[in-house]
């Protein structure tokens, strides 16, 4: 049976945390900031965590990620 490979697009978008969770980055951060408030822009800078409902599916794509 061939080796299971890491989904490379997912590996670039998620990082493993020290406690075993998955850190994700927020959407809506590339352009069109003039329509957003300072508070919205500040919150978009922070990374978020992957929700429990998505965790199992994303973890399967990231088999080789340490």
Swiss-Prot record:
PROSITE patterns: RIBOSOMAL_L35. Residues 1-21 are annotated as: Disordered. GO terms for molecular function: structural constituent of ribosome. HAMAP family: Ribosomal_bL35. Gene3D superfamilies: 4.10.410.60. This is Large ribosomal subunit protein bL35. Belongs to the bacterial ribosomal protein bL35 family. Keywords: Ribonucleoprotein, Ribosomal protein. It comes from Streptococcus sanguinis (strain SK36). Residues 1-16 have a biased composition (Basic residues). One of its GO terms (cellular component) is cytosolic large ribosomal subunit. GO terms for biological process: translation.
């Amino acid at each position: 049976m061939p080796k299971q490979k890491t989904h490379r697009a997912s590996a670039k978008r998620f990082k493993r945390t020290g406690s075993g969770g998955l850190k994700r980055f927020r959407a809506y951060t590339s352009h069109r900031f003039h329509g957003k408030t300072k508070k919205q822009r500040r919150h978009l800078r922070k990374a978020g965590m992957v929700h429990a409902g998505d965790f199992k599916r994303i973890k399967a794509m990231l088999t080789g990620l340490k």
